[in-house]
């Protein structure tokens, strides 16, 4: 299926669907399952240098929500609401394990990457060095984990300042010579184009956007929060928000910065939508948590069917919409159009 082939900069991918970091890929078995399902690559469950971030996993909890915000386990689930923590495994041991899996994956044109959820610059540099020594090819630096505001102090840090981000990425870049360095940004900032450009100046090979949002869901039966706390919230509803920032970032970088879309992909059509806005690949996780690893196979198959029907290659989509995006001032005037979207009483004569 060469029409699915893509790349993130100079790094080739057999298709644009990557399994994102999370609980499904916290074991070697889970990573292999994602690869068997056809994923172009897997971002293995994240680490950092803070024991508190790993301990947080013992307090993790999860809920799938329907469109009305009600907890559900059925097909109506459209959003994942959860709090989480990092893998409870020695960093060197974990990186050795996933490096072996990466070597296996490379024989099939796929990859397995290391990931860190940022806590400190020194820690990120040290962890990145361990990933390089383990022989891994891709390192994801996640500076946008939504849980930062709720986690124990210092366990997780969210970076939203462009100057600090540039300095951080430059340090990590120095520790990852010869590796792909992908920086994952927060969804809790309107400054994503500036943050993306800062990451690029620091030496990032690609930028992923965007992390989930923090939310609070009241349970109308108990009058208490679902899961007992605020938690990270993402779903298909987020896709238009992600698409807008992908397009704005592609424009800010004049197409020079490879982009990875994440948060909201539930179908092959969603992959195509993010591609049109500039994403050369996407990361999926919530769909896997809800539907199993078969969700990866389904999404890839749906995308391939779409491309075949349209007579296109995936690369034809990347940035096509973003490069032609217009603003409000570019639109034709349509006086009275508002009348089509109000109740009839609004238009009655007094």
Regions found by a protein language model. Give the residues of each.
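Glycine-rich, positively charged N-terminal anion/phosphate-binding segment
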Residues: 2-7, 28-106
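Short beta-strand/loop segments at the ligand-binding rim of alpha/beta enzyme cores
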Residues: 11-18, 106-114, 174-186, 250-262
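Glycine-rich phosphate-binding active-site loops on the catalytic face of alpha/beta enzymes
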Residues: 44-50, 140-147, 206-216, 264-265, ...
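Alpha/beta catalytic cores of nucleotide-metabolism and tRNA/nucleoside-modifying enzymes
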Residues: 234-256, 268-350
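Active-site beta->alpha loop and helix N-cap motifs at the rims of alpha/beta catalytic domains
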Residues: 68-162
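Glycine/Thr-rich beta-alpha phosphate-binding loop at enzyme active sites
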Residues: 80-88, 146-163, 195-255
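Catalytic cores of alpha/beta
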Residues: 28-34, 122-133, 189-202, 249-255, ...
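C-terminal helical cap(s) of enzyme catalytic domains, especially alpha/beta-barrels
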Residues: 51-71, 217-235, 275, 287-312
């Amino acid at each position: 299926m060469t029409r699915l082939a893509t790349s993130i900069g100079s790094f080739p991918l057999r298709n644009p669907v990557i399994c994102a970091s999370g609980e499904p890929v916290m074991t070697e078995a889970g990573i292999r399952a994602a690869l068997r399902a056809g994923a172009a690559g897997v971002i293995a469950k994240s680490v950092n240098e803070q024991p508190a971030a790993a301990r947080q996993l013992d307090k993790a909890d999860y809920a799938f929500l329907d469109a009305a915000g009600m907890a559900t386990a059925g097909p109506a689930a459209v959003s994942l609401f959860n709090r989480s923590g990092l893998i409870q495994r020695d960093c060197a041991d974990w990186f050795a394990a996933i490096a072996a899996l990466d070597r296996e994956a490379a024989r099939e044109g796929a990859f397995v990457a290391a990931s860190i959820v940022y806590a400190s610059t020194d820690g990120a540099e040290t962890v990145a060095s361990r990933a390089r020594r383990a022989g891994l090819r891709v390192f994801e630096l996640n500076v946008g984990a939504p849980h930062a505001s709720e986690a124990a102090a210092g366990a997780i840090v969210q970076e939203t300042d462009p100057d600090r981000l540039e300095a951080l990425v430059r340090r990590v870049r120095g520790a990852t010579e010869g590796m792909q360095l992908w920086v994952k940004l927060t969804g809790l900032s309107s400054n994503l184009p500036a943050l993306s450009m800062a990451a690029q100046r620091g030496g990032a090979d690609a930028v992923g956007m965007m992390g989930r949002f923090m939310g609070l869901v009241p349970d109308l039966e108990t009058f208490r929060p679902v899961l007992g706390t605020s938690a990270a919230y993402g779903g298909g509803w987020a896709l238009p928000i992600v698409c807008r920032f992908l397009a704005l970032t592609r424009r800010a970088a004049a197409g020079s910065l490879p982009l990875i879309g994440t948060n909201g992909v539930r179908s092959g059509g969603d992959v195509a939508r993010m591609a049109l806005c500039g994403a050369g690949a996407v990361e999926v996780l919530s769909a896997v948590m809800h539907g199993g690893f078969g969700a990866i196979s389904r999404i890839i198959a749906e995308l391939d069917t779409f491309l075949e029907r349209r007579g296109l290659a995936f690369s034809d989509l990347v940035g096509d919409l973003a490069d032609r995006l217009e603003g409000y001032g570019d639109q034709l005037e349509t006086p009275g159009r508002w009348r089509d979207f109000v109740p009839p009483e609004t238009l009655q004569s007094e």
